[in-house]
Amino acid sequence: MYRPSKNFVRRFLSLPIIFLGLSLEALEISFAGTEKFLTVSIANNDQLRRKGLMHTDDLKQNTGMLFLWQTSGQRCMWMKDTSLSLSVAYLSGEGAIQEIYAMEPYSEESVCSVSPARMALEVKEGWFAENGIGVGNTIIFK
């Protein structure tokens, strides 16, 4: 008889909680086929997505923010009131990275996804390249 692992069950039971807009302070994600991980803050409602990383002066090593939407669509990010240089990855509903862009501090110019995205992941600029993470890599919720 097949029994899913506890990690599998926990991971998939947590997804509805995340997408329903219930607040979670931080969540650990990893990237399939790698040993790379991030601890991310979750922005899963309009208020949290609007605030994003505004007024954040520093990001610790291997941290970021994961923006979640209920449906896939064109997503746009900006850097208003954000002093950090960031990279943003737009991800599919399955968690696959589709596009990665560098973001200029304090820029109010929108950087939009070309492909429909259900998630966006912001990290320190250069984190993706430094860790060998790119288009096609998939996140895993731990």
Model-predicted regions and their roles:
Residues 15-25:
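Hydrophobic h-region of N-terminal signal peptides that target proteins for export
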Residues 24-142:
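Compact, glycine-rich, soluble single-domain proteins
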Residues 4-5, 19, 43, 93:
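A general, composition-driven signal for non-globular sequence regions
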Residues 2-16:
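Bacterial N-terminal signal peptides that target proteins for export
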